[in-house]
Design a protein with these regions (language model features):
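Non-catalytic accessory/assembly modules
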Residues: 179-186, 193, 200-201, 205-209, ...
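Active-site-adjacent "gating/activation" loops or surface patches in catalytic cores
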Residues: 71-73, 79-85, 317-318, 377, ...
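Extracytoplasmic
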Residues: 49-51, 57, 83-87, 146-148, ...
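C-terminal regions of mature proteins
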Residues: 14, 18-44, 258-261, 420-578, ...
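M16/insulysin-pitrilysin zinc metalloprotease superfamily fold
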Residues: 116-121, 152-187, 268, 348-350, ...
Length: 1018
């Protein structure tokens, strides 16, 4: 560092430790008397943070968040995990789509300049290096709906002010000098193209945006004339226009700021108001809102193109129906949120709902956490959207599905607004807000910064969450927007006739066709009566009236989960929550069975079984979830995992178990879900990255069924075979429980007993438990080459994997350090590539059932017959040679920086109880039970020396007596060959040239010669 920069950093650190330094006093005396204090945001009773909203003299509005209480909690309850990062988000709303004549797209270029100049500024003041060393990061975020660009930075608290000063300094004058700009004019055209691409990628609802009026600003960005305007560009004129644009649209009155740290509010205010910080951002007296008025007469989508039906090619087998209605911006209605009331009713999944009927007819059999009906709000317009996945049966009944949707909407119109339903919905939102878990500071500040544009200061926290007032008139008004003739209808499917799709979308480049919606259909949808199956939610949700209370803590709370019970059928781990103290408990359960590992048919049936359970419980548990509970059901290698949270999680668990034992499903429903899962497997194996990773695990593991195996096996599985599978699954089980949170030890034991009594299962015989085992890759290099299953995809990928040894704390920490160093160098090497040989690189280390490996992946996705996977492999080898030299030149100080970043990560305080639970759960399901793993890793980290890294890398990457390398090649193709779902092995000339290397032709034959590592699970 230069001496002046070093002085700034030292000054910053001292200022952070001593709250009354001269620089702070000066800023306080000069600026504080002009700071305007806004109304304090309303917060939840369980939120221990303190908030202050202020407006600086230049008009910039800031939200200050003091999290001092978490420092006390961390020191009391988690001695080791007490690191916390401070975070800052500055959000800029420039004049997006307010281009002057002759300079279309200049707003995009201006935002791009802000980003590139910020990067230069960070490099100049070593902010990148400083944030990296001290566990921090910086990134950009585009808000698609608010047309804003956010700059987010976080770092260890003791270094926060030193970085914040330099961070703020950039925004006082972010524009490059004319001389520097003109020197770079040879790159301007390319940079403008990059800026335009970024802007197109982040325009909200790109498919819909191409349907706006041709004279609407949103539509202008897709015009070819933008590029033409810049072909013979006068760069002096461009600079002048950019300068004018900055003067008009870059103003402190259009900038918002949020900072969060474990420091007093007064200190945070000093940080923001000192002379060197945000008070010097330029301002003007022009309205901060006029450049965001992108609509005329509130009708941006009035073109005939919007009100049509579109058939669009999809890359996925699962079809989808999307319906959208456009409305004027609805932010002003945030207190009553009528749009959310309507979207909640349309997306309701209880009996009598739209989704219940579609599932009954088997037109939809998907269950996910994604909303079925949702709202999109921008400064230009609002949308109400319905997204429904089609089953194979649903694709055959598109018209009937549309009839059903409009029938349900007509019922909502006939019934009108219902205050009791609104009140239930409001209580649900209040509970969710009251008991919401903490977010990471970086995520929190970036989310809240957008709220500063949308709500008055008192509602910064509550504006998007709480329902303040019931307004039946606005509900009726929005329902009246939902008419057939104003709807935009899109149908996505992979199996459309490509000859029928005669157009290409200018945004996404996908094929589509459009058609007018027949007048007969429109009239039918207007008058269709509600189906007799439909009714509104009938009763008040009983789970909303549950009284929440905190259980008393025992005199001594264990630092980690303790085992309360263990026998041949189950084990129970338990820990109360002394830190977060929310009236919520969590039950995680792993139902382990041997049946899923017995064949590819059973492995696939495990997923089908899980999907059927999710479908069966969704209606019954919907009201419980609305009452504040959450649940997740997923498949593991050994069985099924449930994760349940709420005030009474055992209620949900017992319901799930009921359907596990008796999955009362008809043959037609099973076949529909089975066929959909076959399609999902088909989509997965046509993605070359997933195919390569799947094959890599297949070769390494003693038992692993590939997606190809499961795809081919599942197609022929009968309903009777499924019934036998379901019965066998619950006959013999081993069950792992972890219970944490607001629950007593006795209640935890009782919950486990209720679970066992409901299942009435026998224990797994030891001979039936197949522990995960791994093959030892032979010395040298083993190659496996296969064709990309998607014959129209030119993407090729190479994954080179180096198998190391049985896992240990010391070895895993050393490898993590290596990968952290390698990631950065791999990224730099990738950026320096001058050709299009490679489009993506990554490196990783993996614990494959107790055996550690590290790997490098490289993707080539452009059609070029001269580029082979052998060239990619050679590039990887050259990189590893370079990396060896880099390690040899690495200094101890450089290593200390990486170690410090890893230490901060390991010691970062948990933001919510789920972070702790997930860490403990990972130990339990792996049967390792090292709950103090992070503490042990810190001890190991402190003892690792630079020479150990060098020796380790040389030994396992270059020493022929230790190198065990597996090289997977997936070869892309641009041919139009007929496709079949099978692994197609490739024999090429390299196998004959390198006879000393091991080319795998038949995996089973190759594995017969290999040693199998011993069991590594606890």
């Amino acid at each position: 560092l230069k001496s002046s920069i070093k002085s700034d950093l030292i000054l910053g650190i001292l200022s952070d430790r001593i709250m009354s330094t001269k620089i702070m006093q000066k800023g306080r005396n000069n600026k504080n008397d002009q700071v305007e204090y806004l109304e304090t945001p309303i917060k939840s009773e369980y939120d221990k943070k303190e908030y202050r909203a202020i407006r600086l003299p230049n008009g910039l509005e800031a939200l200050l968040i003091s999290d001092e209480d978490s420092k006390t909690c961390s020191s009391q309850h988690q001695d080791m995990k007490n690191e916390m990062k401070a975070a800052c988000c500055l959000c800029v709303r420039t004049g997006t789509f307010k281009e002057p004549p002759g300079f279309s797209g200049i707003s995009c270029f201006f935002e791009y300049l802000l980003m590139t100049e910020f990067e230069k500024h960070c490099l100049k003041y070593d902010i990148v290096k400083l944030t990296y060393k001290h566990g921090g990061s910086f990134k950009y975020l585009f808000d698609y709906d608010e047309y804003t660009l956010s700059f987010v930075i976080d770092i260890q608290e003791k270094h926060f002010l030193s970085v914040l000063i330099h961070f703020a300094e950039f925004f006082t004058n972010p524009f490059p000098e004319k001389e520097a700009f003109m020197q770079n004019r040879s790159n301007i055209k390319g940079e403008f193209q990059t800026a335009l691409t970024l802007a197109k990628n982040r325009v909200p609802q790109p498919q819909l945006s191409s349907f706006t009026r041709t004279d609407h600003p949103i539509n202008q960005i897709i015009e070819d004339r933008i590029i033409k305007e810049y072909e013979n560009l006068d760069y002096t004129k461009l600079y002048e226009e950019l300068h004018k644009f900055k003067k008009r649209h870059y103003s402190a009155r259009r900038i918002k700021l949020v900072i969060q740290a474990r420091l007093p509010l007064n200190t945070l205010e000093q940080y923001v108001t000192i002379d060197t910080c945000f008070v010097n951002i330029p301002t003007n007296k022009l309205s901060p809102d006029d450049s965001t008025k992108l609509i005329k007469n509130n009708v941006p989508f009035d073109s005939a193109a919007f009100h049509k039906m579109y058939k669009i090619s999809s890359s996925k087998h699962v079809g989808q129906l999307k319906i959208a209605w456009v409305m004027p911006p609805l932010y002003a209605l945030y207190k009553s949120k009528p749009y959310k009331y309507i979207s909640w009713l349309i997306g309701n999944e209880e009996k009598g709902s739209l989704m219940s009927y579609l599932r009954k007819k088997m037109w939809n059999v998907s269950v996910s956490n994604e909303e079925i009906c949702y709202n999109v709000h921008t400064t230009a317009y609002s949308l109400l959207k319905i997204d429904i996945d089609f089953s194979i049966e649903g694709k055959r009944h598109v018209k009937e599905v549309l009839d059903t949707i409009f029938s349900y909407i007509n019922m909502l119109k006939q019934k009108g607004p219902q205050k009791n339903i609104y009140d239930d919905f409001s209580k649900t939102a209040e509970n969710s807000f009251r008991y919401s878990e903490e977010k990471d500071p970086r995520d929190n500040v970036s989310n809240l910064c957008i709220h500063l544009y949308q709500y008055p200061s008192r509602d910064y926290l509550t504006g998007s969450k709480i329902y303040f007032e019931y307004d039946p008139k606005t509900i009726t008004n929005i329902l009246n927007y939902l008419t057939p003739e104003t709807a935009n209808i899109m149908i996505f499917d992979k199996n459309f006739d490509y000859l029928e799709l005669d157009k290409v979308n200018s945004w996404s480049r996908v094929s589509y066709t459009d058609s007018e919606i027949s007048q007969e259909w429109l009239e039918h949808w207007k008058s269709i009566e509600p189906l007799p199956d439909f009714h509104l939610p009938k009763n008040v949700n009983p789970y909303l009236g549950v009284q929440y209370f905190l259980e008393p803590l025992p005199a001594k709370v264990p630092k980690y989960p303790v085992k309360l019970y263990n026998d041949s059928i189950s084990e129970l781990w338990y820990r109360p929550d002394p830190k977060f103290r929310l009236p919520i408990s969590h039950i995680y359960t792993h139902f382990i069975s041997s049946v899923g590992l017995q064949s590819p048919e059973n492995a696939a049936l495990m997923t089908v079984y899980c999907n059927i359970i999710k479908l069966l419980v969704v209606e019954e548990l919907y009201s419980v979830v609305a009452g504040g509970h959450s649940y997740d059901i997923s498949v593991s290698e050994k069985g099924i995992i449930t994760k349940i949270s709420g005030s009474m999680p055992i209620v949900l668990l017992l319901n799930i178990i009921k359907y596990m034992i008796y999955p009362n499903v008809k043959k037609e429903m099973f076949e529909t879900i089975r066929d959909q899962q076959v399609d999902i497997y088909s989509d997965i194996i046509t993605e070359p990255e997933k195919l390569a990773e799947d094959v890599r695990l297949w070769i390494q593991k003693l038992v692993h069924y590939t997606y190809v195996d499961m795809h081919n096996a599942l197609r022929n599985v009968s309903f009777e075979e499924f019934q036998n599978f379901a019965k066998c699954f619950t006959n013999r089980l081993y069950i792992q429980h972890l219970i944490q949170g607001n629950i007593t030890q006795d209640a935890a034991i009782e919950s486990m007993q209720q679970c066992f009594e409901a299942l009435k299962c026998d224990s797994l015989h030891s001979s039936m438990m197949q522990p995960n085992r791994v093959f030892q890759i032979p010395l040298g290099t083993s190659y496996y080459k296969l064709k990309n299953i998607n014959k129209c995809d030119p993407t090729s990928i190479v994954i080179d994997t180096y198998q190391i040894d049985i896992t240990s704390i010391e070895l895993s920490v050393l490898m993590k350090l290596i990968i952290m160093i390698m990631e950065k160098q791999l990224s730099l090497k990738f950026q320096s590539i001058q050709n299009d040989l490679i489009q993506h690189t990554s490196c990783n280390y993996t614990d494959v059932d107790g055996i550690l490996t590290y790997s490098i992946s490289v993707i080539q996705s452009l059609p070029n017959k001269s580029y082979t996977t052998e060239l990619i492999k050679e590039w990887i080898d050259r990189f590893l040679e370079y990396f060896k030299d880099f390690l040899d030149e690495l200094s101890e100080n450089d290593l200390d920086d990486v170690k410090e970043r890893l230490r901060i990560f390991k010691q970062h305080a948990d933001m919510n109880i789920e972070e702790e639970i997930n860490r403990n759960w990972n130990e339990i399901i792996k049967c390792q039970y090292i709950f103090d793993r992070y503490e042990r890793e810190i001890l190991a980290l402190n003892n690792i020396k630079l020479n150990e890294l060098r020796e380790w890398f040389d030994k396992y990457t270059w020493n022929e007596n230790y190198v065990k390398k597996l090289s997977i090649h997936v070869i892309g193709s641009d041919s139009a060959e007929a496709q079949s779902i099978a692994l197609e092995y490739i024999i090429d000339e390299h196998q004959h040239k390198n006879i000393e290397e091991n080319y795998i032709i038949k995996v089973e034959e190759y594995q017969k010669k290999l040693f199998v590592y011993p069991v590594t699970e606890g």
